[in-house]
């Protein structure tokens, strides 16, 4: 990523309202955003281009966020993954960490917390 380029965040959620809100929030804060309505669409795109960070919903109809993160690791090892979920379950957090997920954030999302976690994840990403 060039120093003048906007960091690119890929957001995956099956809820169109969440996608729209996250797109607005992230673009307003200076990120370039691509949204995907399911994990399959992201996997199809991930092989063609890469993100600086992925924000992935845990519960989606085609693939859960942890399995999606595991599959992403095969194509884009260095980009951090942040999992968002409405299910406060320690088992999800443990499984997410084992899959290489950088952080798990509970919905409803606290806007500034999400932005802070994305910036921290991108900053810590290997070059």
Residue ranges with predicted function:
Residues 16-34:
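Two-component/phosphorelay signaling modules centered on CheY-like receiver
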Residues 19, 61, 89:
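The feature encodes the CheY-like receiver
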Residues 37-38, 64-67:
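Acidic catalytic/metal-coordinating carboxylates
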Residues 50-55, 60:
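Active-site beta3 strand of CheY-like receiver
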Residues 66-77:
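Short amphipathic alpha-helix used as the core "switch/output" element in two-component signaling
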Residues 67, 88-103:
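Alpha4 helix (beta4-alpha4-beta5 surface) of REC/receiver domains from two-component response regulators
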Residues 91, 109-118:
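C-terminal output helix
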């Amino acid at each position: 990523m060039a120093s003048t380029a906007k960091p690119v965040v890929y957001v995956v959620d099956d809820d169109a309202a969440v996608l729209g809100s996250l797109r607005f929030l992230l673009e307003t804060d200076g990120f370039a955003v691509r949204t995907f309505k399911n994990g399959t669409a992201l996997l199809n795109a991930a092989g063609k281009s890469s993100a600086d960070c992925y924000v992935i919903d845990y519960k989606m109809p085609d693939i859960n966020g942890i399995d999606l993160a595991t599959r992403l690791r095969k194509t884009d090892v260095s980009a951090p993954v942040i999992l968002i979920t409405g299910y406060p379950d320690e088992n999800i957090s443990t499984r997410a960490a084992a899959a290489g997920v950088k952080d798990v954030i509970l919905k409803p999302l606290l806007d500034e917390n999400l932005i802070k976690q994305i910036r921290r994840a991108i900053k810590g990403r290997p070059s």
